[in-house]
Amino acid sequence: MARYTKEDIFRLAKEENVKYIRLQFTDLLGVIKNVEIPVSQLTKALDNKMMFDGSSIEGFVRIEESDMYLYPDLDTWVIFPWTAEKGKVARLICDIYNADGTPFEGDPRNNLKRVLKEMEALGFSDFNLGPEPEFFLFKVDEKGNPTLELNDNGGYFDLAPMDLGENCRRDIVLELEEMGFEIEASHHEVAPGQHEIDFKYANAIRSCDDIQTFKLVVKTIARKHGLHATFMPKPLYGVNGSGMHCNLSLFKNGENVFYDQNGDLQLSDDARHFIAGILKHAPAFTAVANPTVNSYKRLVPGYEAPCYVAWSAQNRSPLVRIPASRGISTRVEVRSVDPAANPYLVMATLLAAGLDGIKNKLTPPAAVDRNIYVMTKEEREEAGIVDLPATLAQALVTLQSNEVISNALGDHLLEHFIEAKEFEWDIFRTQVHQWERDQYMSLY
C-alpha cells in the first residue's frame, strides 16, 4: 500500500484534476456509505473536521447524539479510473469518531482495529486475509432494473462464447489494477452467470477495504456493460450460491507462524490451535459470516458450500480447508463466509475465534477426508461433526450465547446487529411467498 502525506494528496489532487472526493465508510450491515465533497473542502477533510449525521446510518447512534466525524485514512487515497464529466473523483476511506475525539465503537473498521490490538498484545504482528468473492451478472430491463435473466450459461472455467461475461470481467480487472489491486486470477464460476476474481492477500484492514472497493468497482463496471452485478449469496434456486472464502494467516516479524516444516502437514502448533478456535466458535460467528435470510439457502448440501463444522487438508466439503501451499503461503481457508457479510465484522470474529484457540491451546478434532455430504447423520455424530445453524434465527441465538464472538463485536455493534437482524427475520417469517401460493392454494 502506498504511504501518503497530506502534501502528497494535495499535490496529486491538483496534478490529476480531481474535482470531488468521496469520504467513504461502511455501516453496520456492510453497506458502503460516503460523503462527497468538492476539492475546495479537502483541507477541512484532511484536518478531520468533516462532520455528518450519524443517526441516519444503520447501527450508529440516536438522533440526540448524532454529530460524528470522518477521519480519513490517508493511505487509502485512490483516484477512480473511470472518467467523470468535469474532472476526476478520488476516494478516502474513513474511520468514524465521536465529537469528543474518541473512536466510535459502532464503527466496524474501528472495531476490527480494536481486535487487532488484542492480537498484537499476544505477540503477533499481522493478520492477513486473501478473499475469494463471487458474484452473479444479470441482465437489466429497459429501465435499468435487474432481471432474473442471466448474462450467460457458462460453467466452471468456461471460455467465450459460453462465458459471455468475459469482457465485463476483464474490464473489472483492468479498473482494479489501475486502482492498485494485484489481481491473481479471474474466471467463470460453477453456476451460469457466476464469476470470481481473486486478489492478493494483505493485512486485515487493507483486505477489508479492498473487498468494499471491489464490490463498488464490480457494480459500476457491470452497469456500464448493461448488466447488474449482485453479491447476494443465493439469487437462484438449484445452482451454486456465491461465497467469499477467506484465506487467513498470522505473521510474526515477517514470518508465517502457521508454518512448521517439521509439524504434521507442516502446520505449527499455533495453526492447529487457531483451527480449533475457528471450529469451536463457527456456529456463533455464522450470524456475522452469513448475515441474511438468503445466506442459509446457500448453506445446504450439494452445492459446494459447507454445512458442517470440520476441517481437512484437501477435502472441500468441510468448513475449514488447508490449501496445499506451505512456507509463507500457509493458510487456513474458511469456506462458509458469503459476500453479503460486513468484512470488518467477519474478520474481527474470525480473528477472535482463532486467538481463543491459541490462548487456550485448543486441539482440533481429527481431519475429515471423506465427503461429508454423503455421510449419514450417525456417521457425522460419531466423528464429532456438528451442523452450522440452518437459519438466520438459529444463528442469532447461537451468537448471543457465545462470549468470545460477542466480545469481538463489542456491546454497541452486537446490540444493534441483533436488533437489525431479528427485525429482518421477523419480516421474512411473516411474508407469504410465491412458493407457498404455488404449493397450497390449489391443494387446500
Swiss-Prot record:
> What are the record keywords, sorted?
ATP-binding, Cytoplasm, Ligase, Magnesium, Metal-binding, Nucleotide-binding
Q: Which cofactor does it need?
A: Mg(2+)
Q: Does the keyword Ligase apply?
A: yes
Gene3D superfamilies reported in the protein's UniProt record? Glutamine synthetase, N-terminal domain, Glutamine synthetase/guanido kinase, catalytic domain
Gene Ontology annotations for the cellular component aspect, listed alphabetically: cytoplasm
Instruction: Please state how the activity of this protein is regulated.
Output: Inhibited by glutamine.
- Binding residues annotated for ATP, in chain numbering: 184, 249, 316, 321
Q: Entry's PROSITE patterns?
A: GLNA_1, GLNA_ADENYLATION, GLNA_ATP, GS_BETA_GRASP, GS_CATALYTIC
Question: Key word Nucleotide-binding present in the record?
Answer: yes
Q: Name one GO biological process term.
A: glutamine biosynthetic process
State the EC number(s): 6.3.1.2
Catalysed reaction per UniProt?
L-glutamate + NH4(+) + ATP = L-glutamine + ADP + phosphate + H(+)
Endpoints of the signal sequence: none
Localization (cell): Cytoplasm
GO MF annotation list:
ATP binding; glutamine synthetase activity; metal ion binding
**GS beta-grasp domain spans which residues?**
16-101
What is the top EC class of this enzyme, as a single word? Answer: ligase
Which positions in this protein are listed as binding L-glutamate? 240-241, 298, 304, 316, 335
Q: Which residues bind Mg(2+) 2?
A: 134, 189, 196
According to UniProt, residues marked as the site described as Important for inhibition by glutamine are 62
According to the record's subunit comment, the protein's assembly and interactions are: Oligomer of 12 subunits arranged in the form of two hexagons. In its feedback-inhibited form, interacts with TnrA in order to block its DNA-binding activity.
What does this protein do, in the record's words? Glutamine synthetase (GS) is an unusual multitasking protein that functions as an enzyme, a transcription coregulator, and a chaperone in ammonium assimilation and in the regulation of genes involved in nitrogen metabolism. It catalyzes the ATP-dependent biosynthesis of glutamine from glutamate and ammonia. Feedback-inhibited GlnA also interacts with and regulates the activity of the transcriptional regulator TnrA. During nitrogen limitation, TnrA is in its DNA-binding active state and turns on the transcription of genes required for nitrogen assimilation.
Family of this protein = Belongs to the glutamine synthetase family.
Name recorded for this polypeptide: Glutamine synthetase
Its source organism is: Bacillus cereus
Q: From which lineage does this chain's organism come?
A: Bacteria, Bacillati, Bacillota, Bacilli, Bacillales
